[in-house]
């Protein structure tokens, strides 16, 4: 039997990477990982604490290591953090080690999906959330597109429907 390829989900916070990833892994009988949860597991601290103590740079170093380690496995679905693609090394590893699916969403949907979530350090600032999300989109959207094998709009679809679309797109 051929080895199952890895599937890496990228995109902004609130795009549905973790929820869609769980559905996708279940459907394909693959193991699911969320890079943020793995960082928390390995560090013994939540993402907010890592950001507070080590700053975004310290968090990104941890994220790069976790994604590097996880992407060496075979047959996994990995939901990455929204900023993971900022690292060229991470982008290269994702491209080389699996199928990269960019889950695209609008700022409006991101706001609706993240407004009550206190576990998103980049939104816990004085800057209004809309401005933060718009700035992040400007910084990151081209990087998502650069590394993506496929792009799927998640706005008005359930996680299960998006997971089904991914299965059809990648032919697994």
UniProtKB/Swiss-Prot annotation:
Pfam families linked: SKI (PF01202)
Pathway: Metabolic intermediate biosynthesis; chorismate biosynthesis; chorismate from D-erythrose 4-phosphate and phosphoenolpyruvate: step 5/7
SUPFAM superfamilies for this protein: P-loop containing nucleoside triphosphate hydrolases
Entry's Gene Ontology cellular component terms: cytosol
Sites where the protein binds ATP: 14-19, 120, 157
Chain positions recorded as Mg(2+) binding sites: 18
Keywords: Amino-acid biosynthesis, Aromatic amino acid biosynthesis, ATP-binding, Cytoplasm, Kinase, Magnesium, Metal-binding, Nucleotide-binding, Transferase
CDD domains the record matches: SK
Needed co-factor(s): Mg(2+)
Chain sites annotated for binding substrate: 36, 60, 82, 140
Alphabetical GO biological process terms: amino acid biosynthetic process; aromatic amino acid family biosynthetic process; chorismate biosynthetic process
EC number(s) given by UniProt: 2.7.1.71
Compartment(s) of residence: Cytoplasm
Reactions this protein catalyses: shikimate + ATP = 3-phosphoshikimate + ADP + H(+)
Tree of life domain: Bacteria
PROSITE patterns the UniProt entry points to: SHIKIMATE_KINASE
UniProt remark on cofactor binding: Binds 1 Mg(2+) ion per subunit.
Gene Ontology terms, MF aspect: ATP binding; magnesium ion binding; shikimate kinase activity
NCBIfam families linked to this entry: PRK05057.1
Record's subunit section: Monomer.
Family affiliation: Belongs to the shikimate kinase family.
Purpose: Catalyzes the specific phosphorylation of the 3-hydroxyl group of shikimic acid using ATP as a cosubstrate.
Name of this protein: Shikimate kinase
Organism: Aeromonas hydrophila subsp. hydrophila (strain ATCC 7966 / DSM 30187 / BCRC 13018 / CCUG 14551 / JCM 1027 / KCTC 2358 / NCIMB 9240 / NCTC 8049)
């Amino acid at each position: 039997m051929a080895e199952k390829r890895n599937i890496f989900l990228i995109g902004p916070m609130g795009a549905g990477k973790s929820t869609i990833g769980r559905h996708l892994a279940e459907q394909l009988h693959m193991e699911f990982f969320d890079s943020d949860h793995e960082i928390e597991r390995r560090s013994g601290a939540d993402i907010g604490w890592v950001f507070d103590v080590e700053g975004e740079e310290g968090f990104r170093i941890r994220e790069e290591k976790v994604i590097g380690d996880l992407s060496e496995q075979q047959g996994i679905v990995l939901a990455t953090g929204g900023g993971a693609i900022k690292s060229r090394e991470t982008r290269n590893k994702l491209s080389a080690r699996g199928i990269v699916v960019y889950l695209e969403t609008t700022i409006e949907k991101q706001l609706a999906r993240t407004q009550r979530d206190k576990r998103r350090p980049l939104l816990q600032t004085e800057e209004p959330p809309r401005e933060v999300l718009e700035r992040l989109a400007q910084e990151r959207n081209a990087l998502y597109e650069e590394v993506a094998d496929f792009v799927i709009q998640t706005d008005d679809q359930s996680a299960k429907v998006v997971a089904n679309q991914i299965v059809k797109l990648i032919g697994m």
